[in-house]
Amino acid sequence: MARVTVEDCLEKVDNRFLLVMLASKRVKQLYKGASPLIDNKAANKNVVVSLREIASGKVGYELTSRKAK
């Protein structure tokens, strides 16, 4: 499989800081036993798997608004 880059992921996630949060949350899920959403025949590390999932559009996000007090 081709090398995944941050630019590939930024096509799916507009903000690089949001990308870091999304990838780290997905890595935690994978470490806790979640199944990869893509083929991982090369036994890549969870960080690479999470970035490939984001770049392929398998992992997304939803922004929620906070209520002001």
From Swiss-Prot:
Single annotated GO MF: DNA binding
GO biological process: DNA-templated transcription
Gene Ontology CC annotations of this record: DNA-directed RNA polymerase complex
Ribosomal protein is among the record's keywords: no
Catalytic activity annotation: RNA(n) + a ribonucleoside 5'-triphosphate = RNA(n+1) + diphosphate
SUPFAM superfamilies membership: RPB6/omega subunit-like (SSF63562)
UniProt keyword Nucleotidyltransferase, yes or no: yes
Domain of life (superkingdom): Bacteria
Keywords: DNA-directed RNA polymerase, Nucleotidyltransferase, Transcription, Transferase
EC number(s) stated in the UniProt entry for this protein: 2.7.7.6
Function as written in the Swiss-Prot or TrEMBL entry: Promotes RNA polymerase assembly. Latches the N- and C-terminal regions of the beta' subunit thereby facilitating its interaction with the beta and alpha subunits.
Family the UniProt entry places it in: Belongs to the RNA polymerase subunit omega family.
Subunit structure as annotated in this protein's UniProt entry: The RNAP catalytic core consists of 2 alpha, 1 beta, 1 beta' and 1 omega subunit. When a sigma factor is associated with the core the holoenzyme is formed, which can initiate transcription.
Name of the protein described by the UniProt record: DNA-directed RNA polymerase subunit omega
Source organism (scientific name): Geobacter metallireducens (strain ATCC 53774 / DSM 7210 / GS-15)
